[in-house]
Amino acid sequence: METNNKLKILKTGTTTVGIKVKDGVVLAADRRASAGMYVAHKYVRKVLYVAPNIGITTAGSVADLQFIYDLLKNIYHYNLITGMRPITIKALATYLANMLSFSKYLPYIVQILIGGVDEQPRLYNLDYVGDITEEDYTATGSGSVEAIGVIEDEYRPDMTLDEAADLARRAIFSSIKRDPYTGTGVIVSKITKNGHEEKEYYPQRKI
């Protein structure tokens, strides 16, 4: 009963997108934070970085997401200090999946994409019970139905990173038009082995 109540109380909306191509990974998300029908904040950052070449997108309970983000950063830096080499993206995603699975009876209410480039581009989708899948493209959150439709219609494995970034932007803007929990603007991040480049986009207001 406690878990069911937690799920109901913390049900929030958002849209996040991940696209993997040969040159890197694109992560994107809208900027609105909602609690039920209430817009809690208009300018929330949902694309975060564990390292310059590793990013995550966040959806779910803000407190749970903050804890997990800090944990992932600590794991990455601890591995640098003790192992003298960066942890792989696959290992980082697997660690988080195991932690979420162990906590499934008192779960962290999160939906997380982990993406980046080490030996090759990687994109993982994780839910709150620890299910993990490696994807070429994916979308999460309340606006994911609209976003994934746009991506599936236009995605190609041979897309450039710039083309993937534009596709992610348009996918989330399609969700902003239809999903009341998705809004304000879009952050789009292009991640390569050498780091990331980020841009923000906002809808043009009609006069």
From Swiss-Prot:
Pfam families: Proteasome. InterPro entries: Ntn_hydrolases_N, Pept_T1A_Psome_bsu_arc, Pept_T1A_subB, Proteasome_bsu_CS, Proteasome_sua/b, Proteasome_suB-type. It is found in: Cytoplasm. GO terms for biological process: proteasomal protein catabolic process. GO terms for cellular component: cytoplasm; proteasome core complex, beta-subunit complex. SUPFAM superfamilies: N-terminal nucleophile aminohydrolases (Ntn hydrolases) (SSF56235). The active site is at T14 (nucleophile). It catalyses: Cleavage of peptide bonds with very broad specificity. Belongs to the peptidase T1B family. PANTHER family: ATP-DEPENDENT PROTEASE SUBUNIT HSLV, METALLOPROTEASE TLDD. The 20S proteasome core is composed of 14 alpha and 14 beta subunits that assemble into four stacked heptameric rings, resulting in a barrel-shaped structure. The two inner rings, each composed of seven catalytic beta subunits, are sandwiched by two outer rings, each composed of seven alpha subunits. The catalytic chamber with the active sites is on the inside of the barrel. Has a gated structure, the ends of the cylinder being occluded by the N-termini of the alpha-subunits. Is capped at one or both ends by the proteasome regulatory ATPase, PAN. Component of the proteasome core, a large protease complex with broad specificity involved in protein degradation. This is Proteasome subunit beta 2.
